[in-house]
Amino acid sequence: MTRTAKLALEDGTVFTGSSFGASGEVDGEVVFNTSMTGYQEILTDPSYRGQIITMTYPLIGNYGVNEEDVESARPHLSGFIVRENSRRANNFRATGSLGDYLEKHGIVALEGIDTRALVRRIRTSGAMKGILSTEDLDDKSLVAKAKSSQGLVGRDLVREVIPESPIEWDEQLSSWAKLPGEVSSGSNESFHVVALDFGMKWNIARHLADLGCRVTVLPGIATASDVLEHQPDGLFLSNGPGDPEPVTYAIETIGQLMPQLPVFGICLGHQLMALACGARTFKLKFGHRGANQPVLNMETGQVEITAQNHGFAVDEEQLPDHLVVTHRNLNDNTIAGLSHRKFPAFSVQYHPEASSGPHDSRYLFEQFLANMMAVRTPTPAGR
């Protein structure tokens, strides 16, 4: 039996379609993702906390879901919107359908609306607060709820997704996450990396482990002394959800550790590192979400196609002199990468682990290892 569901935006726009997930009512910031595949990774990425995701590709769910392509233990997004949900999972790895997976995990989902019209409205007017409901179907009521709902600005969503206790990571990349012919390289040097988890995707830790690193995952609320107790060779700053500026505890910790350890940050970790250096961030009009974002490497001149998922960016107009722009997003020329002039610290505003997405930027993990090696074995004087 088809169940009616509605999406109401704070500007008064209402879309009516059918539910294919759980029953209920949720609020969130309505955004869009341009990826053609990788929906299971998107669903389980903690960075999507507080958001209602619209997929721009018209047919989603073709290959079902499985037990391997997950980036955390459960979905974290508020709601999910597609043009058409494929009820038939046509893949030998599938263990179930997308709709059943969403219903099992309590995710409200909507199909059958004009997603092109919705995405165009977001692109023109910017990301908006919205309500997705299978219960209240009154347009005026839903719009009023959307207007009064919380947005992302000023909210600390990190505390809602971080682990409760430290984890000694012991899992490497699965065969499906590797490039053809790629094997776990290991390393001639065993580095101990502490990863501050602000909502980390599991494949990031798997990449570090695959390179031979010992990885200790600490909750994002860990202090500098908590980190140093583990005597790490390097500090990794993970991705995570929402506005970076309210995450003041992490900004303070990073600022204390940057003079002492090599640092590599991605996505939210990139923004937090910049804030720790005295920079500021701002909210993008509709964000960067998708596996096809072009980025220019300022040093090499090469263009890298990257996977991105963020609604905030570092403000170049307030960038301190000790930070250097290393990468730029070619769609809007915003900062996509930074490095510190004095300390072995760098960061990027995208996902080099490519789960899902292109593999153009995997070299950044090797760069992190090289920085740890350089600190461990400093160049003798006179060379």
Model-predicted regions and their roles:
Residues K6, D45, P294-L296, T326, ...:
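Residue-level detector of beta-strand face positions
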Residues V108, H192, P262-F264, R280, ...:
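Proline-centered loop/turn at the N-terminus of a beta-strand
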Residues S19-F20, Y57, Q308, S339, ...:
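Short clusters of small/polar residues that mark proteolytic maturation junctions
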Residues M1-S225, E229-H230, P244, S355-G357, ...:
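RNA-binding accessory domains that recognize and position tRNA/RNA substrates
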Residues G301-F343, T379-R383:
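Catalytic beta-strand/loop cores that center a nucleophilic Ser/Cys/Thr
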Residues H192-L196, T306-A307, F346-Y350:
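Active-site-proximal beta-strand elements of phosphoester/diester hydrolases
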Residues N85, G240, F343, E353:
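Flexible loop residues that form catalytic
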Residues D233-G234, S238-Q308, A313, G357-V375:
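Cysteine-nucleophile active-site neighborhood
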